[in-house]
Design a protein with these regions (language model features):
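Cytosolic regulatory regions of ion transport systems
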Residues: 1-215
Length: 215
């Protein structure tokens, strides 16, 4: 369980609060609008109404005590930038800030953000990959050049084993798990046998995955 601060309680911040609550974390939520704070009360441990660009207000929250500080302010990039910078100055361990454009990401990283999330860009990339190929069931970006895909087993792999196909050497990808009847099996060996109804969880570079699965 981690102690987490969320600054900015619009839709994105509210959804983060809900997910973190489901994961069992301690959450302090902050926004300058009372109605936004009221909406997250069922999902957070504590909440305060206040101006996150005010150093005294932030200091009163005990910033150094939080494992993660999320800056999810939308609508005012200036406020997001100031809040990010102040959090770092006040001893925040890890600051994760939201960007809406590429240029914002650069400024946030230069002014205290340890990491930047870009929801619109990330969702657009996910949707474009997920829904343009019928055999791609899910997708998660690992870094700029690697990803994890859930895919249907290629037709030419059916009836063969991992060892026969020599997947890692031939395609430079890793089979993380095989899904059968809704259950993922992670004990992958050279003798793992592919059947028609199998789904695969695979890790690799984008180019290798695109070539292997004809994405």
């Amino acid at each position: 369980m981690k102690n987490i601060l969320i600054v900015g309680l619009g839709r994105f911040g509210r959804h983060i609060a809900m997910q973190l609550n489901q994961l069992g974390h301690e959450i302090m939520a902050v926004d300058w609008k009372e109605e936004r704070v009221d909406k997250v009360l069922p999902f957070v441990t504590n909440a305060q109404i206040g101006d996150s660009t005010n150093a005294e207000f932030l200091q009163s929250l005990g910033i150094g005590n939080y494992d993660i500080c999320f800056v999810t302010i939308g609508g005012s990039f200036q406020n997001s930038l100031e809040t990010t910078s102040l959090l770092k100055e006040l001893g925040a361990q890890l600051v994760i800030s939201r960007a809406e454009r590429d240029v914002q990401e650069k400024f946030l990283l230069r002014n205290g953000a340890d990491k930047v999330v870009y929801p619109e860009k990330q969702v657009a990339k996910w949707a474009s990959i997920r829904y343009t190929d019928d055999h791609i069931l899910d997708y998660m970006e690992v870094d700029a050049s690697h990803a994890i895909f859930e895919v249907e087993v290629p037709e030419e792999w059916i009836g063969k084993t991992v060892g026969e196909l020599d997947i890692r050497k031939r395609y430079n990808i890793n089979i993380l798990a095989v899904k059968n009847d809704g259950e993922f099996g992670i004990a992958i060996s050279p003798d793992t046998y592919f059947e028609e109804n199998h789904k695969l969880l695979v890790l690799g570079e984008y180019r290798a995955l695109q070539k292997c699965f004809r994405i």
